[in-house]
Amino acid sequence: MTKVALLIAYQGTAYSGWQQQPNDLSIQEVIESSLKKITKTRTPLIASGRTDAGVHAYGQVAHFRAPDHPLFANANLTKKALNAILPKDIVIRDVALFDDNFHARYLTIAKEYRYSLSRLAKPLPWQRHFCYTPRHPFSTELMQEGANLLIGTHDFASFANHGRDYNSTVRTIYTLDIVDKGDSLSIICRGNGFLYKMVRNLVGALLDVGKGAYPPEHLLDILEQKNRREGPSAAPAYGLSLHHVCYSSPYNNFCCEQCSVSTSNEG
């Protein structure tokens, strides 16, 4: 059976997150509702992972099994039909038709999140839902020092909020870069997977380092504790975006150019 893969961008401001919730509007619910208008039956979506309330996405990936409908035999027509129905804060960027072996969640080999920060006392109007302005000045040099210590394979239990069950809290961060753009900056984090609120907690810790609350080396002590109570406060959700999800061949050219790059340094 054909699986239809969707590359999705959304502004998470008005939603309770990706996953369908009993009493709140979710991204998943809105897209499934749009599919139902086409198929006249519920078509479940499976995403690469769940984004929290207020978190955005430029490159979320989700799939569904193609119902018996002529529209889903053509990727471009599927994209046009869904975008014609969806609200303006959810966009299908691309559609691919894959074999039954594809799975948006289980075949993920890497994800990249980006967190946006502003140095402006009052963010520009178009930044207010996407860019967090810390109350204290911060040093990007100290933040990068701290970020370098977090790269690699570690037990990130101290950076994971409770609320999800994991077989292991060990994850690998491939890159963690502070990109300074003057009035704004991005924290770009790429890894093989992330725990619940892990990226926002990492950003919170790096901001603590940046404002001088503790030295970069203290991040290693936090890691060693393996205790969320020893970890930092999470940065706000609205600064975070799931930028892209990576898959190996033959699905690696769908969601981003970086998926086709060798992952030999990501073991």
UniProtKB/Swiss-Prot annotation:
Substrate binds at Y113. GO terms for molecular function: RNA binding; tRNA pseudouridine(38-40) synthase activity. Its EC number is 5.4.99.12. Formation of pseudouridine at positions 38, 39 and 40 in the anticodon stem and loop of transfer RNAs. PANTHER family: PSEUDOURIDYLATE SYNTHASE (PTHR11142), TRNA PSEUDOURIDINE SYNTHASE-LIKE 1 (PTHR11142:SF0). Belongs to the tRNA pseudouridine synthase TruA family. This is tRNA pseudouridine synthase A. The lineage of its organism: Bacteria, Pseudomonadati, Chlamydiota, Chlamydiia, Chlamydiales. The gene is truA.
